Amino acid sequence: MIFDFPKKFRFADSHEYACPEGDLVRIGISAFAVDQLGDIVFVDLPGIGTLLEQGISFGSVESVKAVEDMNAPIGGEVLQINESVLNSPEELQNDPHGEGWLLLVKPSDASQLDKLMSSEIYSEKVSSK
């Protein structure tokens, strides 16, 4: 399957993305990860004000196949969570790079974005799977 990953996104090895938006970063999971999970039935996210640490679990996503931890692609403070994904997990499945975003974060160190893969490199990585 061919995936179209937005150019401004940066990706972690564990398939979470970070999308810079001014001084903030929107976090979600990639369309590839969503495709691998299958039908998503539940999403667990941290509360507003939670401090995330890069590479450390911040929540989980449950599908009919598995329960997977989600790791923070960047550290920072959670300013907003996507309530609609909590109420309707299929939004994550239908539009993971758009309406299915998970968190809006104020990064503690924006240079952590440089440690993530570009959309081009990530695309090459997942297309070989």
Swiss-Prot record:
Its cofactor is (R)-lipoate. The keyword Transport does not apply. Residues 24-106 form the Lipoyl-binding domain. The modification N6-lipoyllysine is found at residue 65. Gene3D superfamilies: 2.40.50.100. Keywords: Lipoyl. InterPro entries: 2-oxoA_DH_lipoyl-BS, Biotin_lipoyl, GCV_H, GCV_H/Fam206, GCV_H_sub, Single_hybrid_motif. PROSITE patterns: BIOTINYL_LIPOYL, LIPOYL. Pfam families: GCV_H. Coiled coil: none annotated. GO terms for cellular component: cytosol; glycine cleavage complex. Binds 1 lipoyl cofactor covalently. GO terms for biological process: glycine decarboxylation via glycine cleavage system. Belongs to the GcvH family. PANTHER family: GLYCINE CLEAVAGE SYSTEM H PROTEIN, GLYCINE CLEAVAGE SYSTEM H PROTEIN-RELATED. The glycine cleavage system is composed of four proteins: P, T, L and H. The glycine cleavage system catalyzes the degradation of glycine. The H protein shuttles the methylamine group of glycine from the P protein to the T protein. This is Glycine cleavage system H protein. The gene is gcvH.
